[in-house]
Regions:
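Glycine-rich beta-strand-centered segment in the early N-terminal region that forms part
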Residues: 1, 7-54
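Short, well-ordered loop/turn sites that connect or cap secondary structure elements
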Residues: 41-43, 99, 190
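Loop/turn positions that initiate beta-strands
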Residues: 45-46, 102, 193
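Short, glycine/polar-rich helix-capping loops at beta-to-alpha or helix-loop-helix junctions
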Residues: 55-56, 134-142, 159, 210-216
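Short helix-loop-beta connector
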Residues: 71-75, 98-104, 168-169
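Mid-domain Rossmann-like dinucleotide-binding core that forms the NAD(H)/NADP(H) cofactor-binding site
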Residues: 79-157
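Short amphipathic alpha-helix with an adjacent loop that forms part of the alpha/beta core around
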Residues: 158-169
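Glycine-rich phosphate-binding loop and adjacent beta-alpha segment
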Residues: 181-223
Length: 223
């Protein structure tokens, strides 16, 4: 399951059409070819990744299907670090965020599928990495298992106070997965020339009306 599924249920203008009522829920999938009607690109038994949806079997003309090597990694891996979450994290933080050694990187939803990978990539690149997560268990995971330098527990402390503690010199890159009040808090600590990677807004997915940033001026003065 992916948070994006919630957005795909809304009949609004987006980067992809909504899922039809009574239709198969859109989802990335990994499976094996059990029958092939003369498609030269695949053979019975091939392991493939595709947008097969939430179902046990699907029929495809082969478009959007890609072979994966199940000997190289377990099949679920092609839905995580070697799938959409991994690609989102990789290109988001490197191509959009343009991180460099010494940057301070703040990641919301740091214990999630994308955020957890973003932070590890940033650490490999020599950045100081701080996460934002909800609850002690998630924050411990972010620091002790993923190797982040620090974590703000938005459920049990002031978000702004936590960011100030962990990022006393400000933020060079903010990887935003949630929007809302956490985005508002992060904007206060942007350094001059900071970059924001807008990946998700999960805090807003169930809201009837969208709420914009309260401190938009921070984007102007720290451009």
């Amino acid at each position: 399951l992916d948070p994006a599924m919630r957005g795909w249920m809304n009949d609004t203008k987006s980067y992809i059409p909504p899922v039809e009522i009574n239709g198969v829920m859109r989802a990335g999938s990994v499976g094996k070819v059990i029958q092939n009607n003369n498609n030269p690109n695949f053979q019975v038994g091939d392991c493939v990744s595709s947008w097969g949806g939430v179902q046990q079997y699907c029929v495809s003309d082969g478009e959007g299907c890609f072979k994966v090597d199940e000997k190289a990694a377990s099949m679920p891996t092609f839905l995580s670090v070697l799938g959409m979450p991994g690609m989102t994290a990789y290109f988001g933080i490197l191509e959009v965020g343009k991180i460099k050694e010494g940057d301070t990187v703040l990641v919301s939803a740091a214990a999630g599928a994308v955020g957890s990978i973003v932070g590890q990539i940033a650490k490999i690149k020599g950045c100081k990495v701080v996460g934002i997560a909800g609850g002690k268990e998630k924050c411990d995971y972010v620091i002790n298992e993923l190797g982040f330098d620090g974590c703000v527990d938005y459920k049990n402390e002031s978000i702004k106070r936590g960011i100030k503690r962990e990022c006393p010199d400000g933020i060079d890159v903010y990887f935003d997965n949630v929007g809302g009040e956490i985005l508002d808090a992060a904007l206060v600590f942007l350094r001059m020339g900071a970059r924001i990677v807008v990946c998700g807004a999960i805090s807003q997915y169930n809201e009837m009306s969208a709420k914009g940033p309260d401190n938009y001026l921070s984007l102007l003065v720290n451009r």
